[in-house]
Amino acid sequence: MIVIKRDGSKEPVRFEKVSNRIKKMTYGLNPDHIDSLEIAQKVIAGIYDGISTQELDNLAAETAASLIPNHPDYSILASRIAVSRLHKTTKKKFSETIEDLYNYIDPETNMPAGLINDHTYGVVMKNKQKLDGAVIHERDFNFEYFGFKTLEKSYLLKTHGETTETPQHMYMRVAVGIWGDDFKNVIKTYELLSNHLMTHATPTLFNAGTKKPQLSSCFLLMMSDDSIPGIYKTLSDVAVISQNAGGIGLAIHNVRSTGSYIKGTNGTSNGIVPMLRVFNETARYVDQGGGKRKGSFAIYIEPWHADIEYFLDLRKNTGKEELRARDLFLALWTPDLFMQRVKDSGEWSLFSPSDVPGIWELYGDDFEKAYLEAELSGKARKTIKARDLWTKIIDSQIETGTPYMLYKDAANKKSNQQNLGTIKSSNLCTEILEYTDKDEQAVCNLASIPVNKFLKSTDNRTSKIARGKCEVDHKALYDVSYQTAINLNKVIDVNYYPTKETERSNTRHRPIGIGIQGLADLFAIIGIPFTCLEAKKINEEIFETIYFAAMVASVDLAKKEGKYESFEGSPLSKGQFQFNLWGFNDKDLSGRWDWHKLRKDVMKHGARNSLLLAPMPTASTAQIMGNNEAFEPFTSNIYTRRTLSGEFILVNKHLVRELISLGLWSDNMKNLIILNKGSVQNIPQIPEALREIYKTVWEIKQKDLIDMSAGRGKFICQSQSLNLFIENVNAAKLTSAHFHSWELGLKTGMYYLRTKSAVDAISGLGIDMEKAKKYRETSEEKIPTPVKENAEEKIDMLGMTSEELSKAAEDIMSDIVCSLDNPDDCLACGS
């Protein structure tokens, strides 16, 4: 058979050449579990006469990917093969790549269609040698397969329909796009990105250095005015923001309710629903960057609004279509008074904003006083039992996963922006809390830190990270957090702003948002259960370090560049850090950092940024870096990815390595985990201690996750994207979770509600369930470490042969398939 090379020449396919090429890529991988010969044999079996070298590489990469269940290192091998193919079709020098992107000519119009802005191009061209020499191409070979494929599909810039950038070129483009000719910070940023020690958010990776560098993730708006000009101005603004790939949070507390008098026309209002349907269609029409994805709007409303019941039905599957707006995300901006009325089984009054003007500008005692006065003066459009409205909220959440639950009073009382006025909403993902009004539309630029990369050995004999012999390296975490804050502050200055109101807000208050990813990975590497006391302590100390480092960076910036414009009057100006607003003092913290000195510095010099931390979902960037999302536990221990050539199984890489070390990893063990839909709790051959570590989010008490959110909350000056995962959900369970969040003082009580029915994962698959149950009751034996015997002999098959077990696993696979083309349908890779 003949293979066609890139230059068009032909040569015979040789097994040795294929095998040697694959073997070269296995450096540093586990030689006991990576079989390059097996891959080569499968590749040879799959080729055809006239195959191109590029198709041959694709076949080899996906063949290696199909073996990922055998060992996680196959993911790195598959990625290396794919990266090697990309390197053959792209320029080696960063400057040449930038030149190609800058000089790109649209093939259809034959007009210039360059992707790089003049400033970035000029900096690169003047400093070719320095920048080209700083790029370390070998780091492209450190990606896992699906991380690289995500980059290739959506992030790396393309010309003529082909990928033009390599990952390292993208990282250098981002560094130069942010820092220009400040080469010290360019190199620092490149090194952090390239070594996967931090990542900027998706819009920054997409757009840094390009013609329109819109680098911000989040935008918050208040309805400009309750009038046709005000509503349509806001509609125009959200359309422009959405066009530039921003996610939107919009507060509509000030829009009058159904039946309210309209003075200008002597008519009555149709309420919020017809208006929101217009916003719904705008979200659908104005997609983000020419068909990448639909626009995303979260609509915030307070529960005293007289149209609240219509609002709660907007996303439901049943009912009149003219009363639905299913492409909008819904959120409640909930005052303490409502929660107290629900708790006390009290009455709840609903008002039209036109009857209680300005009440949305109040919180705490001022809001309660105005609300009670409005009740006493008979302004309510309707009075209902608070628990009846609560039931409707719970029903909507169980059916649709929304509305999000945010607590207005906690958000304002614990905000460093409280001197500006009342915060009226959060953003699309519930982690941003910033002030908005008709003249200011809030913006936030984000980055996240993979905390699992910040571990150091506690064994003096080796620097190797081993389970039970490592701890968090707070010094390294401090250094990266410091530079991340410096970077995000710079993004504010080089960012493209879609409206004048966004520019005014961001340059006056200069908020940033630092989050994390890989917390579950960190606990797995250390070898502790997600919600144990040690994990809770580590969780808090990680966020204390990040907050301290970011605050030091902001004070240092203030010394050089001045404090942010609205600093005076803020809690920080009075020496109050976020934990002080939660009622904690310096002595309540770890003792690791000198908060007393920092307090004196911030009161003397000010801070450059009003807000610093905002742990966000990190769905895409965590996948790129091969980490579990944000601060969440593992959703499952096994799931699949679908690509053009078929479905691939992904198994929790930490679990696989543990099982290999115990001699327990095999096809039968893999199939048992599949039958249990990613849970290991009903597999008694796995030691109990290991099962505790690898509990999925469905098997962890939500109370513990809420407690951990409160624990780190005292260091989070914005908020956090806290999802709730409740199996077999009912009103009592969900109500209990909400009230626990509220009573602990969380700002975000719930982002999405994720639910599933509590059905035995292996029922209905021809398995002898009685035998399985009996086995589980009698076989809670501890497996010695390591197990030397053949793992296959240790696995009880629940009354099935290996073939039957494999077939049953295949039958259940379709339920847990995730497509790279449609990730929104998968709970395993984020919201």
For the regions a language model picked out, list residue spans one by one:
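Catalytic alpha/beta core of large soluble enzyme barrels
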Residues: 120, 124-150, 430-436, 488-493, ...
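Extended active-site and interfacial segments that coordinate phosphate-rich ligands
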Residues: 18-25, 232-241, 256, 267-280, ...
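Acidic, low-complexity intrinsically disordered tails
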Residues: 763-831
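Core nucleic-acid recognition elements
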Residues: 9, 32-172
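Active-site cavity-forming subdomains of large catalytic enzyme subunits
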Residues: 85-90, 94-137, 216-463, 467-474, ...
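Core structural elements
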Residues: 51, 66, 142-156, 194-208, ...
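Internal maturation/activation junctions in enzymes
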Residues: 480-503, 507, 511, 529-618, ...
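Long, structured ligand/cofactor-binding scaffold of large enzymes
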Residues: 59, 69, 93, 139-284
